[in-house]
């Protein structure tokens, strides 16, 4: 019979404290203790192989944009700008977030039209090269 104490301690020769319906240890898996580790401090063999489950939305609401999940400065500033009434700009397939528009206006103010044009051309070249 497999008791709770045997399950917690990995008891009586069973592999990791697992028991089948009869209370006997399963025959296929043998776990050897790590050198110098007590049975309670052993970690399961497949601990590194466990998949990290992503949070799922069970409320029926659509999952929001990535910036709502991130706690980055870009995401938080973008979320605040959207809440204040700034809108996204749509250029065909591309969506320009309000924080990017604000960044370009600040660059235009500080650096002037030539520097803004240079940065815009560099951004377009980077986008073109990535495609």
Swiss-Prot record:
One Pfam family named in its UniProt record: DUF4605
Membrane-crossing segments per the record: 99-119
Topological type in the membrane: Single-pass membrane protein
Modified residues (Phosphoserine): 14
Cellular component GO terms held in the UniProt record: Golgi apparatus; membrane
Alphabetical keyword list: Membrane, Phosphoprotein, Transmembrane, Transmembrane helix
Region (Disordered): 1-67
Family indicated by similarity: Belongs to the FAM241 family.
Protein name: Uncharacterized protein FAM241A
């Amino acid at each position: 019979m497999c008791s709770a104490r045997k399950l917690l301690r990995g008891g009586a020769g069973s592999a990791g404290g697992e028991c089948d319906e009869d209370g006997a240890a399963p025959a296929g898996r043998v776990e050897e203790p790590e050198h110098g580790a007590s049975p309670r401090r052993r970690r399961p063999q497949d601990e590194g192989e466990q998949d990290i489950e992503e949070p799922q939305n069970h409320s029926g609401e659509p999952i929001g944009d990535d910036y709502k999940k991130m706690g980055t400065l870009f995401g938080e500033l973008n979320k605040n700008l959207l809440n204040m009434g700034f809108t996204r700009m749509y250029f065909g397939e591309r969506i320009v977030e309000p924080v990017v528009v604000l960044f370009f206006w600040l660059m235009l103010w500080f650096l002037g039209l030539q520097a803004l044009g240079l940065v815009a051309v560099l951004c377009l070249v980077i986008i073109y090269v990535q495609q």
